[in-house]
């Protein structure tokens, strides 16, 4: 077995100046089969990409927050069918837009309260500024993230929902709301709860919402492509050195390949990693089980046919039909689960092969409702976007899967 060929697509985009660098891992049956360290974590400084590089993992944060919430479910402090107003009374009088892209003052009442399960499956009717269009998009972009969770939630509660709770999937701030609820249940800062309930037990010592002064040198620089397809690094500032005023439960974590591998191994291992139990088998089963109806799957997701051969558990995509999923999303047996991050971070766990793949980069993309079409129309972006699927397909082929 030779896995070296899975690097080719990544090295190609790095050599073409479309990507700064990447760290990838292939793990199977309790063995780390491969680690690729490609390119640079800081091009200008000439610092090579290394295994211990810290990445902004964006929405790969979401399953970690969900795991913290499910640990509360395990203890009977929270239930999936609980109305969120029990801990978030700000959202007790939600209205629904008559037209999702229409005026904010044209609404009708919500048929029911938002449930915890609605948050975990993004069926609450909440949104992101980039997942919707019109006045509601602009309103989401003005939310005050820098003033703490209570101020942020109060502002969010003034916005109408884009659809009825439970009707369909709209990618949203739902997990940020979940983070506020988890913090209120435990009466503690979110970073402390996630550390005590997930990161600590799982042995994820390099993961958090802030990066110590000593570890700052390991943080990967964020890049974007300008109009001439040249890499620019003036995208984001350095990591927080102390806990931020509002820990972004839906996208604020930094992590390393080794750390996140431990988290995914925990999910693949029914809640345990290296003999330490983090979650109950039932909570992990719930996270990894498709919960969407056929009607919900008829709708596109961020402009793409995301649900072909796939479903959605508790913030995890789940392969339900490998034959239908494979042509669009690459190889992965029944029950394969995953959730990516906006900056190109990606992972997949395939129970049928006892296999985990990790692919970590730092690239700031175009985030819009038609982002999928924008990528398809730009050869450079399409080339960059296909580097990861080629890595996956070549890995599966080399493993004889």
Curated annotation (Swiss-Prot):
Pfam families: Beta-lactamase. InterPro entries: Beta-lactam-related, Beta-lactam/transpept-like, Diverse_Enzym_Activities. It comes from the Bacteria. Coiled coil: none annotated. GO terms for cellular component: plasma membrane. This is Protein Rv1367c. It comes from Mycobacterium tuberculosis (strain ATCC 25618 / H37Rv).
């Amino acid at each position: 077995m030779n896995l070296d060929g899975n690097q080719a697509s990544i090295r190609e985009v790095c050599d073409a100046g479309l990507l700064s660098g990447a760290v990838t891992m292939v793990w199977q049956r309790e063995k780390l089969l491969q680690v690729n360290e490609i390119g640079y974590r800081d091009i200008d400084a000439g610092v090579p990409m290394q295994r211990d590089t810290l990445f902004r993992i964006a929405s790969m944060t979401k399953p970690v927050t969900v795991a913290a919430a499910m640990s509360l479910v395990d203890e009977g402090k929270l239930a999936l069918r609980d109305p969120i107003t029990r801990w978030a009374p700000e959202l007790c009088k939600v209205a629904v837009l008559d037209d999702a892209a229409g005026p904010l003052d044209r609404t009708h009442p919500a048929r029911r309260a938002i449930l915890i399960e609605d948050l975990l499956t993004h069926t609450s009717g909440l949104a992101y500024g980039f997942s919707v269009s019109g006045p509601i998009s602009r309103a989401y972009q003005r939310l005050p993230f820098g003033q703490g969770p209570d101020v942020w939630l109060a502002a969010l509660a003034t916005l109408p929902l884009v659809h009825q709770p439970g009707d369909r999937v709209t990618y949203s701030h739902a997990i940020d709301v979940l983070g506020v609820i988890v913090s209120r249940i435990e009466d503690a800062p979110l970073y402390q709860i996630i550390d005590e309930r997930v990161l600590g037990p799982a042995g994820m010592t390099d993961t958090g919402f802030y990066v110590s002064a000593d570890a700052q040198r390991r943080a990967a620089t964020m890049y974007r492509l300008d109009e001439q397809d040249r890499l620019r690094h003036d995208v984001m500032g350095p990591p927080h050195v102390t806990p931020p005023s509002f820990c972004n439960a839906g996208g604020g974590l930094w992590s390393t390949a080794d750390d996140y591998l431990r988290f995914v191994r925990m999910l693949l291992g029914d809640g345990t990693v290296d003999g330490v139990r983090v979650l109950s088998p039932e909570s992990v089963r719930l996270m990894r089980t498709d919960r969407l109806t056929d009607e919900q799957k008829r709708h596109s997701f961020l402009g793409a046919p995301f649900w072909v051969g796939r479903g959605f558990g508790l913030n995890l995509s789940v392969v339900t039909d490998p034959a239908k999923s494979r042509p669009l999303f690459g190889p992965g047996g029944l029950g394969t689960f995953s959730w990516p991050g906006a900056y190109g971070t990606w992972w997949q766990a395939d129970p049928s092969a006892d296999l985990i793949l990790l692919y970590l980069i730092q690239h700031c993309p175009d985030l819009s409702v038609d982002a999928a079409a924008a990528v398809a129309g730009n050869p450079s972006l399409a080339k960059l976007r296909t580097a990861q699927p080629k890595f996956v397909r070549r890995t599966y082929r080399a493993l004889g899967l």
